[in-house]
A protein has these predicted regions:
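ATP/NTP phosphate-donor binding region
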Residues: 2-117, 493-496
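Acidic-aromatic/histidine active-site loop/patch
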Residues: 124
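Active-site segments that bind and position negatively charged phosphate/pyrophosphate groups
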Residues: 222, 227-341
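C-terminal charged capping/lid subdomain of soluble metabolic enzymes
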Residues: 2-10, 15-21, 25-26, 202-205, ...
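A glycine/threonine-rich phosphate-anchoring loop and its flanking beta-alpha core
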Residues: 132-228
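Residue-level signal for inorganic ion chemistry
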Residues: 35, 58, 147, 185, ...
Length: 496
């Protein structure tokens, strides 16, 4: 939430023309509560936020609803609160204006009061799009966040940035809009797939490599256990792992807040947490099937580490330690389409975003950071060629495990129609009914054809996923059937 205070004074220009000058200051307040089992009836924290209104409009992913919907409904019923749930299907390819407008439709139909908060439950994609819908609706609608993924809990929950994609540009349309409150419930990780745990692990490497050596050391020590045991939330996790995971999560969030809150609106462009985000925004979307965000930034971070090592900013030992951590985690360090052409295009794009300077964050040494602005194209290419040679020494030539998006990231397909196509079609139909046109679907290039980019896992919802070793990962109570969003139903194992 925010309040704005301003003063107005009369002015006189050098040319003798009168005018006015406004000086304003915006006070932004938002809080975090670390709490387990947020939807347990004994936890009143969430219900207390909605007692004033007697009701709640919630926005969540369809598959989050499949796993937790009954708990949500029982929780609000227990506390005597009405609940309407907008179930959406947000993936990277449908992180778009049509998806946002579908949320706005529900907000309008619900009849939100001016300061009534929307409840947003899901991963970073859900909180990004629904948060932007709240920023746009009546220009400033309150919302409360409950993130459900590692990226959502560690990274997206800290920022006040909300956005949708535009064409091939990530987060090109957006706003700065702080939530009223964020509830951090790490028990959601019990039902998160290994692929999505790994995806979020990259964000913790990002924070710790350039800012927090103690956290980096813990990630290095417990890497495989953290990923396999859902950050200590899976059944059978040792107390040692639970304590380490809780410390990592708390310190990671605290460090992100420490780094981000003085620069919430990104007026300062030298950002420590931009490590891994110099070249990744482009090559994340270069493959026909896009890379997961965590894998894309890992390629960027690993390459940046090689660049830093070439400059002797990190030692050979530190360089190898960092590359080995990515490899142990199953995160990508390279991609066959990451070449000099992609590097050049990505550099050109980021220079525009960063006001003409590269501002590449690199470790110097691990646990601290410096920014590079004087890197020539030749130096970048030399580092890339060396990086490619180094990758030959690692499993899969440095490519990651489950690195590509699936139905949990790109959207969903129902009845042979991609969710992105359905959303665009629904929006076009609505627009047509308002202006008397037929509402013909138009693609981004105006051809009228909408490409189904969800090529990997059509009808992926409710299909079991396997880990890299082909064995279904053990859950906290029983084995898990993984949904399209990376979360899972609990299913009883077959009896002998």
């Amino acid at each position: 939430m925010s309040d704005f205070k301003a003063t107005v004074s009369e002015t006189m220009s050098a040319s003798g023309h009168s005018g006015f000058h406004v000086t304003g200051y915006e006070k932004i307040e938002y809080g975090f509560t670390l709490i387990d089992r947020i939807f347990h009836p004994s936890n009143t924290n969430l219900a207390d936020c909605y007692k004033k209104w007697g009701r709640c409009l919630a926005v969540t992913d369809q598959n989050i609803y499949n796993v937790y919907g009954k708990q949500m409904e029982a929780y609000f019923q227990h506390h005597g609160l009405g609940l309407k749930i907008h179930k959406t299907k947000i993936g990277e390819k449908v992180k778009t204006m049509p998806t946002l407008l579908s949320i706005v439709d529900s907000m309008n139909e619900f009849g939100l009061y001016r300061k009534e908060p929307v409840l947003v439950i899901g991963g970073g994609l859900v909180t990004d799009v629904a948060g932007f819908a709240c920023a746009a609706y009546k220009r400033n609608t309150n919302f409360i966040r409950i993130p459900t993924t590692v990226i959502g809990l560690i990274d997206a929950s800290v920022s006040i940035k909300v956005a949708v994609n535009y064409g091939n540009y990530k987060n090109r349309l957006g706003a700065y809009h702080a939530p009223m409150h964020t509830f951090l419930d790490f028990t959601f990780l019990r039902t998160l797939s290994t692929a999505q745990i790994r995806n979020g692990f990259a964000e913790l490497i990002k924070i710790s490599t350039c800012s927090h050596l103690d956290t980096f050391n813990l990630l290095d020590k417990y890497c495989e256990q953290l990923i396999e045991q859902s950050f200590g939330r899976a059944n059978g996790s040792s107390q040692e792992l639970i304590d380490a995971a809780d410390k990592i999560n708390r310190e990671g969030i605290h460090e992100m807040l420490r780094l981000e809150t003085p620069n919430l609106h990104e007026i300062g462009l030298d950002r420590v947490i931009a490590y891994g985000h110099t070249w990744s925004p482009l090559h994340e979307l270069v493959p026909e099937t896009p890379l997961r965000h965590g894998h894309a930034i890992s390629i960027d971070m690993a390459y940046s580490a090689t660049l830093a090592n070439n400059r002797k900013l990190i030692s050979d030992e530190e360089h190898r330690r960092l590359l080995n951590l990515f490899s142990r985690a199953g995160l990508s360090m390279d991609h066959h389409q990451f070449d000099e052409d992609v590097l050049s295009k990505a550099t050109t794009a980021i220079l525009k975003t960063r006001d003409g300077l590269l501002r590449a964050a690199v470790p110097n040494p691990i646990g601290s950071c410096t920014f590079l602005n004087d890197v020539s194209a030749e130096e970048m290419n030399v580092a890339l060629r060396r990086h490619k040679e180094l990758m030959k020494e690692y499993p899969r030539n440095g490519e990651g495990i489950e690195a590509y998006v699936d139905a949990s990231d790109t959207g969903y397909t129902e009845n042979s129609q991609a969710e992105e196509e359905r959303m665009v079609g629904a929006t076009a139909k609505k627009a047509g009914s308002l202006n008397g046109t037929s509402g013909k679907i138009q693609s981004a290039n105006g051809t009228g054809a909408v490409k189904n980019t969800n090529s990997m896992n059509d009808h992926h919802t409710n299909k079991n996923k396997t880990h890299a070793n082909g064995v279904l990962r053990k859950g906290s109570v029983t084995e898990k059937e993984v949904n399209g969003n990376g979360h899972a139903h609990f299913v009883e194992p077959a009896k002998a």
